[in-house]
């Protein structure tokens, strides 16, 4: 019998994106999935629309915007009927109907795999990769998506161990997620997914990229199109938290210098591109 899955979609004032995501989830082929929408105190009529259009999906309503980590943790904890596996999925995605099976198959066949994550494409450029695995070097101050903005090719067609699973879509055994302590709620947004993977790896776990599982992410594939000062600030706060938490104390000063240097380069580069696009 197929292992049971609880799938969580976090929503905050993202009605249209969430409705599209749920529409794709209605078509999934895995036989034993329960879909939950965690609403972070939305004010855009999301809850009513979801209830009307997707009555089979359960809504967990939180009183305010708890952010990514706390919101997902709270929704997960409020579900009394735990499943064998837990999947967290961004609301700004659409999924392949078959995306669940490869993730569960890999988790069931190898107990050392603690997280499985799919190949993720840009929704506005269907053959181009947004996430083909993750690579981390906190000592040098960088965290990278492998394959980002590259056209899909055979090099991204094989299972492989990676440094982290993106929170955009990650599958775990429920007991593993609970025993590791869930998401660290000191991360409001950005960095919590990398932190979770690092904690699993520090305990000897593997993070597996599973390209047979496919989803599409609704972010722009254009360089600089996604840039905002607020996002840049939050990402770098998350990165500094990761450095402070996961590397040796004597490495922290040099790592912070490199992080600040590369972050300022990113800021200048992205701001320049953004200005040129407005001309």
Regions found by a protein language model. Give the residues of each.
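Short, acidic, metal-binding catalytic loop of nucleotide-sugar glycosyltransferases
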Residues: 23-32
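A short, conserved alpha-helix in the catalytic core of glycosyltransferases
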Residues: 163-214
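Non-catalytic, C-terminal membrane-associated alpha-helical segments of glycosyltransferases
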Residues: 228-279
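Acidic helix N-cap motif at the loop->helix transition within catalytic regions
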Residues: 19, 44-52, 61
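Conserved donor NDP-sugar-binding/catalytic core segment of glycosyltransferases
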Residues: 93-131, 136-138
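A recurrent flexible, glycine/aromatic-enriched loop bordering the glycosyltransferase active site
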Residues: 143, 150-175, 194, 224
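Short aromatic/hydrophobic "clamp" motif used to bind/position activated sugar donors
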Residues: 86
């Amino acid at each position: 019998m197929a292992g049971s899955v609880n799938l969580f979609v976090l929503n905050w004032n993202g009605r249209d994106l969430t409705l599209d995501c749920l529409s794709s989830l209605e078509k999934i082929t895995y036989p034993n999935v329960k879909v939950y929408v965690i609403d972070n105190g939305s004010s855009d009529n999301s809850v009513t629309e979801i209830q009307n259009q997707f009555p089979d999906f359960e809504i967990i309503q939180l009183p305010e915007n708890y952010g990514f980590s706390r919101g997902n943790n709270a929704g997960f904890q409020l579900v009394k009927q735990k499943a064998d596996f837990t999947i967290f999925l961004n609301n700004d995605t659409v999924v392949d109907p078959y995306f669940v099976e490869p993730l569960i198959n890999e988790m069931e066949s190898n107990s050392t795999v603690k997280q499985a994550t799919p190949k993720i494409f840009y929704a506005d450029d269907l053959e181009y990769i947004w996430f083909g695995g993750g690579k981390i070097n906190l000592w040098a101050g960088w965290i990278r998506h492998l394959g980002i903005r590259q056209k899909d090719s055979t090099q991204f067609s094989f299972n492989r161990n990676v440094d982290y699973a993106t929170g955009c879509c990650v599958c775990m055994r429920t007991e593993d997620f609970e025993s590791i302590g869930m998401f660290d709620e000191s991360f409001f947004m950005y960095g919590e997914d990398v932190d979770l993977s690092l904690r699993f790896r520090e305990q000897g776990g593997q993070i597996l990229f599973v390209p047979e599982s496919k989803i599409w992410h609704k972010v722009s594939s254009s360089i600089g199109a996604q840039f905002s000062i607020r996002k840049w600030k939050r990402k770098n706060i998350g990165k500094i938290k990761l450095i402070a938490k996961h590397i040796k104390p004597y490495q922290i000063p040099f790592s912070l210098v490199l992080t600040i240097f590369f972050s300022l380069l990113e800021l200048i580069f992205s701001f320049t591109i953004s200005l040129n696009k407005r001309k």
